[in-house]
Design a protein with these regions (language model features):
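Short glycine-enriched, charge-decorated loop/helix-capping segments at active-site entrances
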Residues: 2, 92-98, 166-174
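Radical SAM enzyme core and accessory elements
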Residues: 191-196
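A structural motif corresponding to the C-terminal lobe/cap of the Radical SAM core domain
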Residues: 138, 147, 163-188
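Catalytic cores of large soluble enzymes that bind and process phosphate-bearing ligands
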Residues: 5, 128, 177
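Canonical Radical SAM [4Fe-4S] cluster-binding loop centered on the CxxxCxxC motif
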Residues: 1-7
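Conserved AdoMet/S-adenosylmethionine-binding subsite of the radical SAM
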Residues: 11-157, 161-164
Length: 196
């Protein structure tokens, strides 16, 4: 259960964005949780941003694709997308969800040629198998709308959130990846022509 501090309409959020627009070079990125659980909000806020020439990005798992999400994507310049694993069984172990919806989302982004930055969470013992890394890189290298890949080394900073939610944190014993593992993963991804 989330503790909502306050709620904002897209118009109220846009007023906050405008206050800092002169001080930042980038645009607006909506992340979460999962922003596409509120696609009407994303579409409305991004439309306001686009009307003033601001760049828009959404950070998503790509698990949800429906007409409202497609509408939100019309006003989205860039999608930051997590593909946590390419093996469906291992993806389910890592996320608790099936991979297929995310693959459908990726296919849609490919069809509309929407620019993507892919995020790969490197979790020792879960997403660091060399054969899986090659399969992942081979898949991603076939997506011509992928502009770059970011390797996100696993960390334990989210552990407290799980405690507050009274949920079991299955990765509590996992250590962050070593510099060597990050370097090896980077080399594998680059060997497929990916910009890392």
């Amino acid at each position: 259960m989330c503790k909502v501090q306050y709620e904002m309409t897209p118009e109220e959020a846009f007023k906050e964005v405008i206050k800092v627009k002169a001080f930042v070079k980038g645009g607006v990125t909506i992340s979460g949780g999962e922003p596409m659980l509120q696609p009407d909000f994303v579409a409305s806020l991004f439309k306001l941003c686009k009307d003033t020439g601001m760049h828009t990005a959404v950070d998503t798992s790509g698990f949800i694709l429906n007409d409202k999400v497609r509408e939100a994507l019309k006003y989205t310049d860039l999608v930051l997308l997590d593909i946590k694993h390419i093996n469906p069984e291992k993806y389910r172990i890592l996320t608790g969800k099936p991979l297929k919806p995310t693959l459908k989302f990726i296919e849609y982004l490919k069809d509309i040629n929407k620019p993507i930055w892919i995020r790969y969470v490197l979790v020792p013992g879960y997403s660091d198998d060399e054969a899986d890394l090659h399969n992942w890189a081979k898949f991603v290298s076939g997506l011509k709308n992928v502009e770059r890949v970011d390797i996100l080394p696993f960390h334990q900073m989210g552990m407290q959130k799980w405690k507050e939610l009274n949920q079991e944190y299955k990765l509590s014993e996992v250590n962050p990846p070593t510099a060597e593992l990050i370097s090896k993963t980077t080399e594998i991804f680059r060997s497929y022509g990916l910009k890392v």
